[in-house]
Amino acid sequence: MRLSILAKIIDMLSPRYCPVCGNRLNGEEESICVSCNLFLPRTDTWKDPYNNEMAKMFWHRIPIEKACALFYYKGHAFTSNILYQLKYSHRPEVATDLGILLAQEGMKVHFFDDIDGIIPIPLAPHRQRQRGYNQSEEIAKGIAQVTHLPIYTNIVRRNVFKESQTQKDRWRRNENVKEAFELYPSYRPDQEKGKNKSGSIAGRHFLMVDDVCTTGAVSYTHLTLPTSDLV
């Protein structure tokens, strides 16, 4: 990234820092410094997106076609700083750059072929107001910059937020997000019978984007809405 003169002045007045190591970023670096980016514990889910540890979370539960993750997350590891920064330190640009990195990996293996659009996992309204943005939507924006896929934020909404998923086991995670999502009231699947009807999502393939996938509970609940149009 080559900075303009104005951007360089802004960078001097308000320097940018790597969310992983905390070192100051130089003008050619994005949100994550070159060194930390190099050592991110990337997954190998790209090698077989139809048969990997993430995809297997959803086998026999929903008709998922493929799944991938950019890197492994472990609490108190250096990568945990990334999630902390984008969730609690108002760093939406970190999420966007992660989306770009993810999309660049996926483009190498044609992961996005046959995908019609992106649906970021929505936050509860009060959570989004507190945070100022939805980190999953910011990741989706980064993916869209590379793939040019449209982002849909008006199809699904989160109507319930009970408790944070952090520190919960698999069963409690599943219980915590039951009935947490719904289609927007304006969405009427019964009015979208025609295959070519403008705006219809029936029969289309969507990429669901979340920032962290631990047990797949949130994604599973999101994908089992009371309509087959999202599956």
Question: Which sequence ranges carry the predicted segments?
Answer:
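Glycine-rich phosphate/pyrophosphate-handling loop used in enzymes and phosphotransfer proteins
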Residues: M1-L223, S228
